[in-house]
Amino acid sequence: MRSPTQPTLSRAVVESVLADGLGAVEVVDAAELSGGTFATVWRAALADGREVVVKVGPLPSARLLTYEKGVIPAEAEYCRLVRDRAPDVPVPSVLAASDDWIITTLLPGRPLAGQDAPRARLELGAAVAALHEITGPHFGYTGDRPSGRDWPTAFAAVVAALRADAAAWKVPLPPLDGVIERHHDVLAAVSRPALLHFDLWDGNVLVSPSGGLAGLVDGERYLYGDPLLDLVSPALFRRIEDEPEHPFLRGYRPEPFDAAARTRLSLYRLHLYVLMITEGPSRGIRRTDGRHDYLTGLLNAELALLG
């Protein structure tokens, strides 16, 4: 099912974007790629031998969550930043970009699936650790999206924006008043705004034919903050702190998870579940399909842990 945020593109439109970005190029083959639910993504083979990816963002008429505004340019920012500051981490090269679309090189490999490719997961952990050495200018998102002078302020703003979006979309959430504020002190222990990918679920991690890490894609949701936030999506719907032999952790090599770290991880799962619940209507997902109730159950479990 196509998400309401994904524009329907013809090959002619893709060729027009390529001409705008790359000039006079001949397209010998092009096809839409599946897997995402936000933008529309095509793969194109050019007569000069290059294979590229064309990503086109939502139409201006599409309703988006607050933090999603401007994410197509943000992806270009992320790729350029990583290639400049962490060149050993495989991300696409940006060939051209605008406010509405981005053209990048095509990375080899296939998305992670299930429990396969432990070597790729280990190498992913090491790559993310390298990315976390990059320090940002502030906490939170870039532009006029939620951010703050410190991590407690920024994180509270991020969650508050999602709650406001949920209210606007009439998406029910469990009571959340005061939860973030009660844990101000553990959040305040984060003093450096590290570069975070945030969206490290299996579909955004590419595996080479030999089983190693081939690439990270879809960095448009990046922000700056606590490195622990990036430890949530690699073990989606699970508690990675309870899986010490998880290959991602063996590659990342975090400090031992003390009580404060476990509390922060619980807060970051809360954030992810609030986001996933809230984005349902914008993606055309019916509340009756079971997803809303499943995510609400996970969210309530984290709330019980947080007290």
Predicted region positions:
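Short, flexible/disordered intra-domain loops and linkers
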Residues: 2-6, 60-70, 285-291
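Short, surface-exposed alpha-helical segments at coil->helix boundaries
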Residues: 11-12, 73-76, 242-246
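Helix-rich C-terminal or lid/interface subdomains of diverse kinases
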Residues: 33, 160-161, 189-191, 221-224, ...
